[in-house]
Amino acid sequence: MGAHLVRRYLGDASVEPDPLQMPTFPPDYGFPERKEREMVATQQEMMDAQLRLQLRDYCAHHLIRLLKCKRDSFPNFLACKQERHDWDYCEHRDYVMRMKEFERERRLLQRKKRREKKAAELAKGQGPGEVDPKVAL
């Protein structure tokens, strides 16, 4: 995800979303049937598993299962391959989804800027097909 840094510093920063901030557009904008993502693991389960704050994400339920498996089969560290795979795959899907959300936010910001520019041109009287009076003379 380094391309956003280059576009942010060298390109137009007004249409590039800040990756550290929450999205400015509602998640169901353009998707009326879209459901909100829900955490599978509850706050109490994450506290009981003593997960650090950095690990409390949408894949925490897989991590809790992995840590439990590691604890239950301690000497045999290879016994938890499936749990590890499930957690890694969930983290990958979460990363891809966040990148898609970032790209969606960037495109919506570009669209908003284009619409504002078009509205400003129409308000000035220089819409498509119209000629500025100074140019017509």
UniProtKB/Swiss-Prot annotation:
GO terms for biological process: aerobic respiration; mitochondrial electron transport, NADH to ubiquinone; proton motive force-driven mitochondrial ATP synthesis. Residues 56-98 form the CHCH domain. Disulfide bonds join C59-C90, C69-C80. A motif (Cx9C motif 1) lies at residues 59-69. Residues 113-137 are annotated as: Disordered. Complex I is composed of 45 different subunits. Contains two C-X9-C motifs that are predicted to form a helix-coil-helix structure, permitting the formation of intramolecular disulfide bonds. Belongs to the complex I NDUFB7 subunit family. One of its GO terms (cellular component) is respiratory chain complex I. The gene is NDUFB7. InterPro entries: NDUB7. It is a peripheral membrane protein. Pfam families: NDUF_B7 (PF05676). The keyword Aminoacyl-tRNA synthetase does not apply. It comes from Homo sapiens. It comes from the Eukaryota. This is NADH dehydrogenase [ubiquinone] 1 beta subcomplex subunit 7. Keywords: Disulfide bond, Electron transport, Lipoprotein, Membrane, Mitochondrion, Mitochondrion inner membrane, Myristate, Phosphoprotein, Primary mitochondrial disease, Respiratory chain, Transport. One of its GO terms (molecular function) is NADH dehydrogenase (ubiquinone) activity.
